[in-house]
C-alpha cells in the first residue's frame, strides 16, 4: 500500500496541472528509486533529503523533477554512483576535494561537514570541490552550517546557461550562491541563482507548456525569447543563447551585476579548485566537471555568538516591521517563506506537476519499479508529450 496521508490518489488541482502527495509517499518513492540507481540505503536517504527539502521549500525546479536527469547522467556515465570524494589538498582552514564524478549531493555533504569541522576548530573552514555533479539547492549546505550555529555559504558552477552582458553565447552557469545564519524566530536563509532564473525553472515552464516571461531568456542569435523548448534545446546543443544574468541583458538594468556575481561564484568553485569552468562543464563524454565552494564561519571568532545572534535577530525584526508600500501588508526576510512553505506542505502535501509524474512513471518502467505501488489510483495523462508508454 502507498504511504500517503493525503489520500490514495492525492489532491488534484486541475487548473494548475498538479497533484499533491504526502511527504511520506514521496520520501518512500525517492528512496526506492535511488537504491535502484545503485546507491546504498544511507546514500539514498541523503540524496532524497536534499531533493525533498527543495520541494518542501517550494523550490520545485530542484526537487523530484531532477530525478530523471540524474538517471540519465548515470546511464551516460557522467555520474559514477560508486565514486568517493578524496581530499587532494588541505590546510587547517581549507581543503580541496576531488569528487571523482560522484553524486553531487553526497560529495557536497561531505565537503560542508569538513568545512564545519574546520570552522569549529579554527573559526573558519573553506572547502572547494572539483569533478562533481549537480548538487541540488545550494541552500541545503549553507543550512547545514547554520544548524550547527555557524554562518554557512555554498555555491556551485554548472553547465553554461548564462549569457554574459552584451553576449549571445552562454558562458557561465546559473551559479547560485546561498548564505544561512542562525537567528530568531527562524534563521536567515538566502539562496538564489545569479541568472534571472535557473534552467530548472525553464524545465518547469516547458512541462507546464507555458511561454517564458519576458526578460528571462535569449535565443541563439541573442534576441529575447519566450520559447522554453527552443531555449532549452539550444542550451543542450550548445547552439547559443541561454538565460540572462540577474538584471537582464542591459547595463542600465544591472545586467553587469548579475554577471559579476556569477563570476564570484566561479572564483569560489572552479578557479580555487583548479576545476572545470562553466563554459566547459557538461562537454565531456564521461563527466560533467561541475565544481562547488563551501564556507563555514564561527560567530565566536568575532565575539559572543549569542549576542551576535540577538543583534542579527533584532535587525531582521526591524526589517519586517519597517513601513510597507501601499497595498502591501508584509515585508519578508530571507528564509521566512521557506519556513511557511515547509509547514504548509508537510501538512497538506507537496505538489508534483502531471508531466513530472509522467516522467517518474517512465522512470519506474525503466527501473522495473511498480509506479502504482507508490501512487495508487493516479491516472497518467496519456496525451502528455513526456509520455513514452514505458511504465
Language model features: what each stretch is:
Residues 88-98, 109-125, 225-247:
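Residues forming anionic-ligand binding surfaces in small-molecule and nucleic-acid pockets
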Residues 95-184, 192-193:
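A generic, well-ordered mixed alpha/beta core segment in the N-terminal half of proteins
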Residues 162-236:
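Phosphate/diphosphate-binding glycine-rich loops and adjacent basic-rich segments that engage nucleotide
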Residues 62-116:
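Active-site cofactor/substrate anionic-group-binding motifs, chiefly glycine-
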Residues 211-281:
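Secondary-shell segments that build the walls of catalytic and ion/ligand-binding clefts
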Residues 6-29, 267, 272, 277-391:
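Catalytic-core signal marking the mid-to-C-terminal active-site face
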Residues 2-23, 28-47, 52-53, 60-81, ...:
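Acidic, glycine/proline-rich low-complexity segments that act as flexible tails and inter-domain linkers
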Amino acid at each position: 500500500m502507498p504511504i500517503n496521508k493525503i489520500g490514495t490518489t492525492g489532491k488534484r488541482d486541475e487548473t494548475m496541472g498538479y497533484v499533491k502527495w504526502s511527504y511520506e509517499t514521496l520520501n518512500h518513492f525517492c528512496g526506492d528509486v535511488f537504491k535502484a540507481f545503485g546507491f546504498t540505503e544511507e546514500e539514498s536517504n541523503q540524496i532524497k533529503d536534499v531533493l525533498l527539502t527543495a520541494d518542501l521549500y517550494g523550490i520545485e525546479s530542484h526537487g523530484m523533477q531532477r530525478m530523471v536527469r540524474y538517471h540519465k547522467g548515470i546511464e551516460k556515465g557522467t555520474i559514477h554512483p560508486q565514486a568517493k570524494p578524496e581530499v587532494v589538498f588541505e590546510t587547517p582552514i581549507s581543503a580541496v576535494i576531488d569528487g571523482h564524478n560522484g553524486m553531487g549531493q553526497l560529495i557536497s555533504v561531505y565537503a560542508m561537514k569538513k568545512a564545519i569541522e574546520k570552522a569549529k576548530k579554527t573559526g573558519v573552514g573553506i572547502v572547494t570541490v572539483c569533478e562533481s555533479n549537480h548538487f541540488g539547492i545550494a541552500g541545503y549546505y549553507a543550512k547545514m552550517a547554520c544548524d550547527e550555529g555557524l554562518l554557512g555559504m555554498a555555491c556551485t558552477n554548472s553547465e553554461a546557461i548564462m549569457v554574459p552582458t552584451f553576449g549571445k553565447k552562454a558562458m557561465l552557469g546559473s551559479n547560485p550562491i546561498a548564505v544561512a545564519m542562525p537567528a530568531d524566530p527562524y534563521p536567515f536563509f538566502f539562496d538564489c541563482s545569479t541568472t534571472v532564473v535557473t534552467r530548472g525553472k525553464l524545465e518547469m515552464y516547458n512541462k507546464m507548456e507555458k511561454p517564458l516571461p519576458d526578460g528571462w531568456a535569449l535565443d541563439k542569435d541573442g534576441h529575447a525569447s519566450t520559447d522554453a523548448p527552443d531555449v532549452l534545446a539550444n542550451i543542450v546543443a550548445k547552439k547559443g543563447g541561454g538565460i540572462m544574468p540577474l538584471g537582464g541583458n542591459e547595463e542600465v538594468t544591472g545586467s553587469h551585476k548579475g554577471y559579476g556575481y556569477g563570476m564570484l561564484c566561479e572564483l569560489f568553485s572552479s578557479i580555487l579548485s583548479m576545476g572545470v569552468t562553466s563554459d566547459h562543464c557538461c562537454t565531456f563524454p564521461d563527466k560533467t566537471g561541475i565544481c562547488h565552494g563551501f564556507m563555514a564561519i564561527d560567530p565566536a571568532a568575532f565575539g559572543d555568538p549569542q549576542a551576535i545572534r540577538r543583534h542579527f535577530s533584532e535587525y531582521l525584526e526591524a526589517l519586517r516591521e519597517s513601513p510597507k508600500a501601499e497595498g502591501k501588508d508584509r515585508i519578508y526576510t530571507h528564509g521566512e517563506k521557506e519556513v511557511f512553505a515547509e509547514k504548509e506542505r508537510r501538512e497538506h502535501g507537496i505538489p508534483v506537476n502531471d508531466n513530472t509524474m509522467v516522467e517518474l512513471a517512465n522512470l519506474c518502467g525503466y527501473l522495473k519499479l511498480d509506479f502504482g505501488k507508490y501512487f495508487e489510483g493516479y491516472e497518467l495523462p496519456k496525451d502528455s508529450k513526456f509520455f513514452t508508454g514505458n511504465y
